[in-house]
């Protein structure tokens, strides 16, 4: 009970700070590079399946996203796939040149698991062409003075492991992921000093195993009749458990074998929106706290305490929530050097009666999460229906993590908004500039209060394959002409970042 009250107290403190800080800002903040700490890192981010292409080249094996998008095009909004994507596999030097031209300090990219290990696991052999590609990318970045931030897993589980034992549904994946991470550390760790084990494990769990709208597309039939298999009441928790253990094992390998010589840092990139109470009632405040427990805290709490959030323990009925052994708990506690925060949008949370039928991870918190209150959206909508713009949420999440989870070192590892694809080359993205200005100001506010934020990565450097939305929306600072040889055109927002970042060099 004490833990529940502590969580609610932290939540209320952040809400109170929100009210105080809300009075400080006008609509569009003016930013300077000097508003941020001298060592603050600015970068841009991508992921392997979304930008690389070359899906069937140089020995790469298929991932679950190749299968999901190529075999079932009806599951993608525009029927497309990432087989060519932004073609960064062939155009990586041009992309590094764009990063350098804009003035970014760092580049966050992910490594394609099946490009390194195309045949199940380590026993199937390492694909040297994959090693060579990432060595070339890393070396090109360093030659331009750009720090590589590498993500080991960004949703693209090898299809061979999905076939062998169900991917992250199988306990075997923990050791296979550990071995894959070991290969990455061994081959790239002499130059890569910032690692993220996983990107958004929450999205993997929610969209891949509850909603069924992302690979591998599993869910309960009552949630999505297009799912051919799955169980939204049990599978998400099994997958989440294995993701957490895989992270822990990878960090353990790094610390035991590589940290002393390579002197790098290992973290994880976690996503969550901020959840505001739907009303001022105590019930809705508790519902908002539960919504946080089942999203950000779900993956953060085990890394701090070695346990699941108490709200999850209390609300996931019927023995569906796995438990950590004493040995696993010890391994997980403190298994991060920094926490990546991916933020796009926020929601309201309203207390609702707990369901005893058609139960899933979504219903377990007994909280209805919605982007509207009394018919009014929490903020303006971007191109995607889920992306309602609420800049204060990024500050509130940073402060929440600071006060609840021992003041961790944090990076904003993704932040951005999209516009709809029109078929025309449109480089005037003033709405994106406003989005970044608003959110960066909120990050600066959080730092001024004491949040230990060390950097910010824009999503994304390039227009790319946006998962179930395909190419119907664009998140890039750089326009990619998918009908014209993947030619790149910097948008107005890229020039805005260049002006912001070049101030440092002038001074």
Curated annotation (Swiss-Prot):
Catalytic activity of the protein: Hydrolysis of terminal, non-reducing beta-D-glucosyl residues with release of beta-D-glucose
Signal peptide: 1-22
Top EC class of this enzyme: hydrolase
UniProt superkingdom: Eukaryota
E.C. no: 3.2.1.21
Keywords for the protein's UniProt record, in alphabetical order: Disulfide bond, Glycoprotein, Glycosidase, Hydrolase, Signal
PANTHER family tied to this protein: BETA-GLUCOSIDASE 12-RELATED, GLYCOSYL HYDROLASE
Listed name of the protein: Beta-glucosidase 12
Organism the protein comes from: Arabidopsis thaliana (Mouse-ear cress)
Upper taxonomic lineage: Eukaryota, Viridiplantae, Streptophyta, Embryophyta, Tracheophyta
């Amino acid at each position: 009970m004490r833990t529940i009250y502590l969580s609610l107290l932290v939540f209320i403190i952040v809400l109170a700070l929100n009210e105080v800080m809300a009075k400080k800002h006008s609509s569009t903040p003016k930013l300077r590079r000097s508003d941020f700490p001298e060592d603050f890192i600015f970068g841009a981010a991508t992921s392997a399946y979304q930008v690389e292409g070359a899906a069937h080249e140089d020995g790469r094996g298929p991932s679950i996203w190749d299968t999901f998008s190529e075999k079932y095009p009806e599951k993608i909004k525009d029927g497309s796939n990432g087989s060519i994507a932004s073609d960064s596999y062939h155009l990586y030097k041009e992309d590094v040149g764009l990063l350098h031209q804009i003035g970014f300090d760092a580049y966050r990219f992910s490594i394609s698991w099946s490009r390194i290990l195309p045949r199940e696991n380590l026993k199937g052999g390492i694909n040297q062409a994959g090693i060579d590609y990432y060595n070339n990318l890393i070396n090109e970045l360093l030659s331009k003075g750009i720090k590589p931030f590498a993500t080991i897993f960004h949703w693209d589980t090898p299809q061979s492991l999905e076939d062998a034992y169900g991917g992250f549904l199988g306990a075997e994946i923990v050791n296979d992921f550990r071995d894959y991470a070991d290969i990455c550390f061994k081959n790239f760790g002499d130059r890569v000093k910032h690692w993220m084990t996983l990107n958004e494990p929450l999205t993997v769990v929610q969209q891949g195993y509850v909603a069924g709208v992302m690979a591998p597309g599993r869910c309960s039939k009552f949630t999505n009749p297009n799912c051919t298999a799955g169980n939204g009441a049990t599978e998400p928790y099994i997958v989440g458990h294995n993701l957490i253990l895989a992270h822990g094992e990878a960090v353990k390998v790094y610390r035991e074998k590589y940290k002393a010589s390579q002197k790098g840092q290992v973290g994880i990139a976690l996503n969550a929106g901020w959840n505001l109470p739907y009303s001022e009632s105590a019930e809705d405040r508790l519902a908002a706290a539960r919504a946080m427990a089942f999203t950000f805290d779900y993956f953060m709490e085990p890394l701090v305490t070695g346990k699941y959030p108490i709200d999850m323990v209390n609300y996931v009925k019927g023995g569906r929530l796995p438990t950590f052994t004493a040995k696993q708990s010890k391994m997980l506690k403190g298994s991060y050097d920094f926490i990546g925060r991916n933020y796009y949008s926020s929601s309201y949370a309203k207390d609702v009666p707990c369901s005893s039928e058609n139960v899933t991870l979504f219903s377990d918190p007994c909280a209805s999460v919605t982007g509207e209150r009394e018919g009014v959206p929490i903020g303006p909508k971007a191109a995607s229906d889920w992306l309602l713009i609420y800049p204060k949420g990024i500050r509130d999440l940073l402060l929440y993590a600071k006060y609840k989870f021992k003041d961790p070192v944090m990076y904003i590892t993704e932040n951005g908004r999209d516009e709809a694809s029109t078929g025309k080359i449109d480089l005037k993205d003033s709405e994106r500039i406003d989005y970044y200005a608003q959110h960066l100001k909120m990050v600066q506010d959080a730092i001024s209060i004491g949040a230990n934020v060390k950097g910010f990565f824009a999503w994304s450097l390039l227009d790319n394959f946006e998962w179930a939305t395909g190419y119907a929306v664009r998140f890039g600072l750089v326009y990619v002409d998918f009908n014209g040889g993947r030619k790149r055109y910097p948008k107005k927002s890229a020039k805005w970042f260049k002006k912001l970042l070049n101030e440092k060099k002038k001074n």
